[in-house]
From Swiss-Prot:
A Pfam family it matches: DAHP_synth_1
NCBIfam families (UniProt xref): KDO8P_synth, PRK05198.1, PRK12457.1
Organism of provenance: Pectobacterium atrosepticum (strain SCRI 1043 / ATCC BAA-672) (Erwinia carotovora subsp. atroseptica)
UniProt xrefs under SUPFAM superfamilies: Aldolase
InterPro entries xref list: Aldolase_TIM, DAHP1/KDSA, KDO8P_synthase
Keywords: Cytoplasm, Lipopolysaccharide biosynthesis, Transferase
Primary localization: cytoplasm
Enzyme Commission (EC) number: 2.5.1.55
The name this protein goes by in its record: 2-dehydro-3-deoxyphosphooctonate aldolase
Biochemical pathway: Carbohydrate biosynthesis; 3-deoxy-D-manno-octulosonate biosynthesis; 3-deoxy-D-manno-octulosonate from D-ribulose 5-phosphate: step 2/3; Bacterial outer membrane biogenesis; lipopolysaccharide biosynthesis
Record's catalysed reaction(s): D-arabinose 5-phosphate + phosphoenolpyruvate + H2O = 3-deoxy-alpha-D-manno-2-octulosonate-8-phosphate + phosphate
Keyword Transmembrane helix: no
Annotated family: Belongs to the KdsA family.
Amino acid sequence: MTNKVVKIGDIPVANDLPFVLFGGMNVLESRDLAMRICEHYVTVTQKLGIPYVFKASFDKANRSSIHSYRGPGLEEGMKIFQELKQTFGVKIITDVHDSHQAQPVADVVDVIQLPAFLARQTDLVEAMAKTGAVINVKKPQFVSPGQMGNIVDKFIEGGNDQIILCDRGSNFGYDNLVVDMLGFNVMKHASNGSPVIFDVTHALQCRDPFGAASGGRRGQVTELARAGMAVGLAGLFIEAHPDPANAKCDGPSALPLDKLEPFLQQIKAIDDLVKSFPELDTSN
């Protein structure tokens, strides 16, 4: 299998290249907090020599409760993203939830993300494909790794083959997720070598069966991330917050911002080691 290279500007993304970090905050809470978090990520990744793409959502359209914070919206969100790009020179990834958002978002950011819950919505896939932007497809919790090839095919039929796939866990009974480490390789093969990344933040979610917000297991983020990166992946997706207990979305799964550097030191060491090994085919 040949590993496909997808380029985000001058950043190459491939399963056999040094990993790319997709990281930032779950949702834009304020302009000032976005600047603070982005600056910290930029400082740490530059120090460690890790290619970096900033992540945040401008609208969390799939919150469990109608009363939950969703974000600043499209117009204000794009203004914040433009300022981040101008200030720090970063590439940016964000998600879209409606077809009409695809082009306005693609005009500002570098990667547009197809949310897991919407990954089989053909109208949205077609609208995103038409932008020509790099696409990050989240694997739905209810879809097997091998079925991701069908979603990739939709994008290719729509004229866009610049696809990254992202695993964020699979349903395990009610209100729980697990990550199948063998599934990463299945996704690579099902998509003809497309880059595969791991969203360790959302894989740590666990729900209160009667509550209106997701719980999480941030205390296990290092172990799960290390396990995933040992497979050999194109990138890692992780969200951080300076005060996870008071984050407006998914705080229980967020990495404390002050732990980012030591965390990434471990991840980079594993990635460097794994990708120094020659490929070993044990299928025959």
